[in-house]
Amino acid sequence: MACLTDLVNLNLSDTTEKIIAEYIWIGGSGMDLRSKARTLSGPVTDPSKLPKWNYDGSSTGQAPGEDSEVILYPQAIFKDPFRRGNNILVMCDCYTPAGEPIPTNKRYNAAKIFSSPEVAAEEPWYGIEQEYTLLQKDTNWPLGWPIGGFPGPQGPYYCGIGAEKSFGRDIVDAHYKACLYAGINISGINGEVMPGQWEFQVGPSVGISSGDQVWVARYILERITEIAGVVVTFDPKPIPGDWNGAGAHTNYSTESMRKEGGYEVIKAAIEKLKLRHREHIAAYGEGNDGRLTGRHETADINTFSWGVANRGASVRVGRETEQNGKGYFEDRRPASNMDPYVVTSMIAETTIIWKP
């Protein structure tokens, strides 16, 4: 007799051409991911071939009850690591029935920036280092920490191994493989400085695809932690005191930066970022003031700085980039709860389009 696991793992491709498409969108808080599934004829690899759908926006904080319908526009397709076969995950953005982007649809403006001729010609590349913290479900206390108490001081946990230093590796590895299966360009993982905190990296990705991939990677992580009975938080400072916060360092380059003489282009771009520091900080995530203190490998939130190999700066340039005279730089200011659509497009807009 079949058990529940057998039925969950049924391979539909043996018996039907129908597929399950899981439509994913961002809810009213700007950080809560929502999803629901529908049956379609398959296989499908082009999002433009997928139908639009709708949902009750009054239940997600995105529409009033008397006019609650919000329309989902499919934008990117990924393979579904949970259902497998020809089943898919579909990243969507959200519109009114009249076709206007709703206020929480940050993808719409980002796509406009990335499709502008100036930005498209520069082919911006991004590598995003997404940090997060795993919490015990019943206590909201970091995984591996004693209930009501604290582990030993930071030091042995970064990239650490062993049962007393590494907590949640099964979740991290499952997420790593699931992202690779889905077609996300996840480039690595590591344990972070605070115990119970981890990081995955997505990229290099070009333009709008960076935001799509980070959001779907977050979705997959939340689904895996759901299965494991663990809570994932993207709070930039989940534990007050002498503990590292969580960021989303954003590595960035343009075609001009990757060519000979690119280091001068990088320095000019950093100068532009300095001039718009306040605007960027305002868009780089909620609660970032608790993280950007000038301690724990961060710069002070009120002061812009940059340096070569300096992890205490707002922007870090790698030693290799300096030596080669071309390459990329790292914006270390974004918080772990930042919206990648906002951050990636804002960096491109400031460094390519904006004229001081």
UniProtKB/Swiss-Prot annotation:
Its main location: cytoplasm. Its EC number is 6.3.1.2. GO terms for cellular component: cytoplasm. Residues 106-356 form the GS catalytic domain. Gene3D superfamilies: Glutamine synthetase, N-terminal domain (3.10.20.70), Glutamine synthetase/guanido kinase, catalytic domain (3.30.590.10). GO terms for biological process: glutamine biosynthetic process. InterPro entries: Gln_synt_N, Gln_synt_N_sf, Gln_synth/guanido_kin_cat_dom, Gln_synth_cat_dom, Gln_synth_gly_rich_site, Gln_synth_N_conserv_site, Glutamine_Synthetase. Coiled coil: none annotated. Found in all the tissues examined with higher expression found in tissues of the root. It comes from the Eukaryota. One of its GO terms (molecular function) is glutamine synthetase activity. Transmembrane segments: none annotated. It is found in: Cytoplasm. Keywords: ATP-binding, Cytoplasm, Ligase, Nucleotide-binding. The keyword Cell membrane does not apply. The keyword Cytoplasm applies. Residues 19-99 form the GS beta-grasp domain. It holds the Pfam family Gln-synt_C. It is an enzyme of class 6 (ligase). Homooctamer. Belongs to the glutamine synthetase family. Plays a role in the flow of nitrogen into nitrogenous organic compounds. This is Glutamine synthetase root isozyme 3. The lineage of its organism: Eukaryota, Viridiplantae, Streptophyta, Embryophyta, Tracheophyta. The gene is GLN4.
